[in-house]
UniProtKB/Swiss-Prot annotation:
Similarity comment: family membership: Belongs to the SAICAR synthetase family.
GO cellular component: cytoplasm
PANTHER family tied to this protein: PHOSPHORIBOSYLAMINOIMIDAZOLE-SUCCINOCARBOXAMIDE SYNTHASE
Reactions this protein catalyses: 5-amino-1-(5-phospho-D-ribosyl)imidazole-4-carboxylate + L-aspartate + ATP = (2S)-2-[5-amino-1-(5-phospho-beta-D-ribosyl)imidazole-4-carboxamido]succinate + ADP + phosphate + 2 H(+)
Protein name: Phosphoribosylaminoimidazole-succinocarboxamide synthase
GO biological process terms held by the UniProt record: 'de novo' IMP biosynthetic process
């Protein structure tokens, strides 16, 4: 079995029964179930949702996205072996820990396969809920260029690279392109202030202005739960991105929940504690791959400058990355997943065939 066979690169062509277009994102694809299948599964499986709640099958891939591009490796390797299963396993672990600690629910109702979630359709809050405990990455790059205000928060002078901040900073950005909001540029992923959100809470999809405080509380609590757990395995939770949305429970009550993934190497930076204390950074996240790309290409500005997107897309399309770099990243994902969950990630020989089999035989979602 070749590496390419073990990688799930294309995840939007599964024969899952649906009457709507498949939504294909950078890493995950979403298959909206028919009303009949949603009602049937809710009844058969006893999901704690309204009887008419729309459900979806969310399938993760092994594709690797960085700097808004999808990258590939030598030998026609179109993803990172084990990446999808590792990300899902980590998210599953944190969502369970959130539940154990009395935090909000997630959109996940069932886990038929390591690559697959059955989820309840949520109304997304249009915010990338980012929080930072250390100054690094894009914030550090902006700081070195003289910026001191981030999302309405003023940072002090004389901070050093990778330094722990005095408090957890909430630095939200827009999710997608939002139009007609005063003071918010109509571009994707632009930083916003709390006042931006308060003044336009409905345009960010909050049901009421009070829910802004609820989302901030859930963000801080979720960060704290993960940070505490990572400390026990000698890892530092540096920064992360959460996403939130609204669903209705079985009684028809609206509630704010966590959605997408949480605390993964894709959505977070995770550092090795011992290395950090000795003055070194060992990245146990996708950030190491980003740094590899910046060092690999002679003109890293292409990867950082949003005015050079066409060049960036061409760079990703025309360059197969060294196999060693792809496998190093695979090891990063598999190792940190095993540390966090306490169990090794088993690579599937043919993930697509396995997914089809379980959805056909156990969920009757494949004709």
């Amino acid at each position: 079995m070749s590496l390419s066979d073990q990688v799930l690169a294309v995840n939007d062509d599964l024969p899952i029964r649906t009457d709507k277009p498949v939504h294909s994102g950078k890493v995950r694809s979403v298959y909206w179930l028919t009303e009949e299948d949603s009602r049937r599964l809710i009844k058969e499986k006893g999901y704690n949702v309204a009887p008419d709640a729309p459900l979806a099958i969310m399938v993760i891939s092994d594709r690797i996205s960085a700097f808004d591009c999808i990258w590939r490796g030598e030998g026609d390797l179109k993803g990172i072996p084990g990446k999808g299963a590792a990300l899902n396993a980590i998210s599953n672990h944190w969502f369970q820990l959130f539940k154990d600690n009395g935090l909000a629910d997630s959109h996940i109702l069932d886990i038929p396969h390591p690559f697959v979630w059955i989820v309840q359709k949520a109304k997304p809050v249009m915010i990338e809920a980012i929080c930072r405990q250390y100054i690094t990455g894009s914030m550090w790059r902006a700081y070195t260029q003289g910026e001191r205000e981030f999302c309405g928060i003023t940072l002090p002078e004389r901070l050093e690279k990778d330094e722990q901040l005095a408090e957890l900073l909430l630095t939200p950005s827009t999710k997608g392109i939002l139009k007609g909001i005063d003071g918010v540029p109509e571009v994707d992923d632009v930083n916003i202030t709390r006042k931006n959100i308060e003044d336009n809470y409905d345009k960010f999809n909050f049901s009421c202005v009070e829910d802004i405080a609820t989302y901030e509380k859930l963000l801080k609590e979720g960060f704290a739960v993960i940070a505490k757990a990572l400390t026990k395995i000698d890892q530092i939770f540096v920064d992360t991105k959460f996403e939130f949305g609204y669903v209705e429970d079985a009684q028809g009550n609206e509630k704010l929940i966590y959605m997408d993934e949480v605390g993964t190497p894709d959505s977070s930076r995770i550092w090795d504690t011992k290395a950090y204390r000795s003055g070194h950074i060992i990245e146990n996240s996708k950030e190491g791959f980003r740094q590899f790309l910046l060092n690999h290409f002679p003109d890293p500005d292409i990867l950082l400058n949003k005015n050079r997107m066409e060049e960036r897309f061409a760079l990703a399309k025309e360059n197969a990355l060294p196999l060693e770099a792809m496998m190093d990243l695979s090891k990063t994902y598999l190792d940190i997943a095993a540390k966090i969950t306490g169990a090794p990630i088993t690579l599937s020989d043919n993930p697509k065939a396995e997914i089809i089999k379980v959805l056909k035989e156990e969920y009757q979602l494949v004709d």
